[in-house]
Amino acid sequence: MKKYSKKDRQMKLQVAIEENPFITDEQLAEKFGVSVQTIRLDRVALSIPELRERIKHVASVNYADAVKSLPIDEVIGEIIDIQLSKSAISIFDVRSEHVFKRNKIARGHHLFAQANSLATAVIPNELALTTQATVRFVRSVNEGERIIAKAKVRPATDNRAITIVDVKSYVGDELVLKGKFEMYHATQK
């Protein structure tokens, strides 16, 4: 691991965050071979907000007007990327209120809600409803983990007002949920 001077590290840190505003302090610390505290001090010195604030900023600037099928504040998780009728990505941080108290495992309806609301959000119509969902929970998710849900819209096979959206949710690189959502939507006039 190459050691950088403070000035070089801060310049590279700024570039890394500009390229990926969703990178964590822990990932940055590993990338630059320094402590998380050093990264936090560098961020403060550069006036770069913490991850949660960066995510909120990106989502509010880019996606508040893009989502038509439901208000942005009704989306479970935070949308970090969306291309209507194509794909979308959201993140959801599992906190104490989302888990069973006795074993700290996330309640399944939170994972489902994130995936379902993402499947709804990617539909470009004002009315989008789930008509059928097939969901498989691959592994349990624990308190403190971050779920990244990725939705992909399948190409339409006919003129029906049904669109199929596949959603896969991950913790890191590990698949935790896989779902197929059939979405009814009012056709655009």
Swiss-Prot record:
SUPFAM superfamilies: Thioesterase/thiol ester dehydrase-isomerase
An MF annotation (GO) of this entry: DNA-binding transcription factor activity
Keywords of this entry: DNA-binding, Fatty acid biosynthesis, Fatty acid metabolism, Lipid biosynthesis, Lipid metabolism, Repressor, Transcription, Transcription regulation
An example Gene Ontology biological process: negative regulation of fatty acid biosynthetic process
HAMAP family reported in the protein's UniProt record: Transcrip_fact_FapR (MF_01814)
Family to which this protein belongs: Belongs to the FapR family.
Function field: Transcriptional factor involved in regulation of membrane lipid biosynthesis by repressing genes involved in fatty acid and phospholipid metabolism.
Protein name stated in the entry: Transcription factor FapR
Species, as recorded: Listeria welshimeri serovar 6b (strain ATCC 35897 / DSM 20650 / CCUG 15529 / CIP 8149 / NCTC 11857 / SLCC 5334 / V8)
Gene that this polypeptide is encoded by: fapR
